[in-house]
């Protein structure tokens, strides 16, 4: 299965595939609204005829429908990006859109519980860092319709225990007992912040 995903702010492909009967489908460009997934903020994709052709060929080779398109909100895109980043997957806004689309596909029964999904994240999150900062600072412009969730804000945090006297620095590495003390105290502090306990 291939699942396409579009924001409700830029969704001409999604709207095209809303019509279940291929013979009745008519492609209509849309006027896009501000979207965090800027690389996908296209209201009239020039490659749409090719997309339709390839999707039809792919569907025709399978015994059942294999091409799907889902729609997500800007809120879902940003929340998904932040969830991915909190869990160690550095995702851009388009990656957040992919993750939100996978969730929607599961909710709609397109992707079954026993199936595995592969998500496409097209860029490094640093390319779209301003959107993460807007999420942290509650500074999204109203047209994005994004209201940050406090629990998803993953601010960078300085970790330096008060009892730690020596830390490694450029040109000043630690060794021996100093390095051992640094590793032990930093590990203990991180475990404390995360609420981890020894097993």
List the model feature ranges, each with a label.
Residues 2-7, 117-121:
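Extended hydrophobic secondary-structure segments that form protein cores and membrane-embedded regions
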């Amino acid at each position: 299965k291939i699942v396409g995903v579009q924001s409700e702010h830029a969704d001409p492909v999604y709207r095209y595939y809303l019509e279940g009967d291929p013979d009745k489908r008519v492609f209509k460009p849309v006027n896009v609204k501000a979207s965090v997934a800027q690389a996908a903020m296209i209201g009239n994709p020039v490659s749409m005829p090719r997309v339709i052709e390839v999707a039809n060929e792919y569907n025709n080779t399978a015994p059942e429908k294999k091409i799907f398109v889902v729609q997500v909100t800007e809120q879902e895109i940003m929340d998904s990006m932040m969830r991915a980043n909190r869990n160690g997957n550095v995702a851009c806004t388009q990656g957040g859109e992919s993750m939100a689309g996978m969730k929607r596909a599961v909710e709609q029964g397109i992707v079954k519980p026993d199936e595995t999904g592969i998500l496409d994240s097209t860029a490094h999150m640093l390319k779209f860092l301003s959107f993460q900062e807007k999420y942290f600072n509650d500074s999204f412009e109203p047209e994005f319709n994004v209201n940050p969730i406090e629990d998803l804000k993953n601010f960078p945090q300085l970790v330096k225990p008060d009892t730690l006297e020596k830390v490694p620095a450029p040109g000043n590495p630690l060794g021996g007992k100093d390095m051992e003390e640094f590793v032990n105290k930093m590990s203990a502090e991180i475990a404390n912040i995360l609420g981890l306990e020894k097993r």
